[in-house]
């Protein structure tokens, strides 16, 4: 009993210290992105049905719509660099904070974070903005949402590009296996969120920097992430994505939408075999191996990723993107 009491006291102190040490001031990521990139990012809240999402926009209102979905532990801000390239080319870029993240609504309960709800949010966003079809891009956990949307709502997607996220059935057909410690850790209720807060979010910040290219995630950028993680207990609702992960796929997983799968060379989270195996499920797909970059390549090489997306999203369209110059 004494050992249990000591253990309980240690856990309580850990939770208390984590809560205190992770407190952050409010920061305006939209204003920071405007100042950094010279793009007129604007923000508003959009009712998508079950929840209200915080959404940032860039580019001309009459441009072809592109929705970009962030992953864990990021938020819309992670896509700001490629979004600026797309906006300059004439696309209307839509950057939602997905449910449970940053300024978007954070419903209670685990069922609210099932994949069908997350997909429903993006379909609802397309409807709320008055679009019939969009070009869709995604990274990491945003890719899980985007893949399912491409499988189950192909009529809403014009073209689909995914970075560092494999098809949901690809792991079964690849010759690799992986055990992700952080996915296992995130299955534990509450504790990961408090542990993440310790030492000014040291666990998350150090993991991002250890798995990214040298120089990525500068301190100013990391401060924006810290504020997003702290806002209204977001770190806890972000974790619910992992605990509510299971949602059986009731089809063969075929994707008819033209799809570009982008593979970074040094992704330490998604095995390359999984990414390559994704092509087996595509009726009209292509694989682009970058030869550089990590799991966070959209932030490491924003100009390059942005130009790749401009090229892919402009294909077979009556609309022509504005010239950007440079090479991919």
Q: Where is each model-derived feature located?
A:
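C-terminal amphipathic helix plus adjacent low-complexity
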Residues: 320-324
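Flexible "cap/lid" subdomain of the alpha/beta-hydrolase fold that forms the substrate-access gate
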Residues: 14-55, 65, 92-94, 101-137, ...
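Short phosphate-engaging motifs
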Residues: 75, 203, 234, 304-305
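Catalytic histidine-centered segment of alpha/beta-hydrolase-like enzymes
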Residues: 293-302, 306
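Conserved HGGG/HGGXW glycine-rich cap/lid loop of the alpha/beta-hydrolase fold
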Residues: 58-103
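N-terminal Sec-pathway targeting helices
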Residues: 1-12
């Amino acid at each position: 009993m004494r050992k249990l009491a000591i253990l309980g006291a240690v856990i309580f102190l850990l939770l208390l210290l984590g809560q205190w040490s992770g407190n952050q001031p409010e920061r305006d990521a939209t204003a920071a992105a405007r100042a950094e990139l010279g793009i007129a990012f604007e923000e508003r809240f959009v009712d998508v049905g079950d929840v209200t999402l915080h959404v940032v926009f860039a580019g001309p209102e009459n441009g072809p719509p592109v929705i970009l979905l962030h992953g864990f532990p990021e938020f819309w801000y992670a896509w700001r660099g490629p979004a600026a390239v797309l906006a300059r080319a004439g696309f209307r870029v839509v950057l939602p904070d997905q449910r449970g993240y940053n300024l978007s609504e954070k419903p209670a309960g685990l069922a609210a974070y099932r994949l069908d709800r997350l997909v429903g949010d993006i379909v609802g966003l397309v409807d709320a903005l008055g679009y019939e079809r969009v070009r869709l891009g995604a990274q990491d956990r945003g890719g899980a949402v985007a893949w399912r949307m491409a499988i189950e709502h192909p009529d809403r997607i014009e073209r689909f590009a995914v970075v560092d996220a494999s098809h949901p059935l690809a792991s079964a057909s690849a010759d690799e296996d992986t055990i992700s410690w952080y996915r296992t850790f995130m299955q534990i209720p509450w504790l990961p969120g408090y542990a993440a807060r310790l030492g000014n979010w040291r666990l998350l910040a150090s993991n991002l920097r250890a798995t990214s290219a040298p120089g990525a995630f500068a301190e100013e950028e990391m401060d924006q992430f810290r504020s997003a993680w702290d806002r209204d207990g977001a770190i806890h609702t972000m974790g619910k994505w992992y605990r509510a992960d299971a949602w059986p796929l009731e089809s063969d997983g075929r994707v008819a939408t033209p799809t570009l799968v982008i593979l970074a060379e040094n992704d330490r989270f998604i095995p390359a075999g999984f990414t390559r195996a994704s092509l087996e499920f595509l009726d009209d797909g292509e694989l682009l191996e970058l030869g550089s970059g990590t799991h966070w390549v959209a932030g490491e090489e924003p100009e390059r990723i942005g130009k790749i997306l401009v090229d892919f999203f402009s294909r077979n369209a009556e609309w022509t993107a504005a010239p950007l110059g440079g090479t991919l």
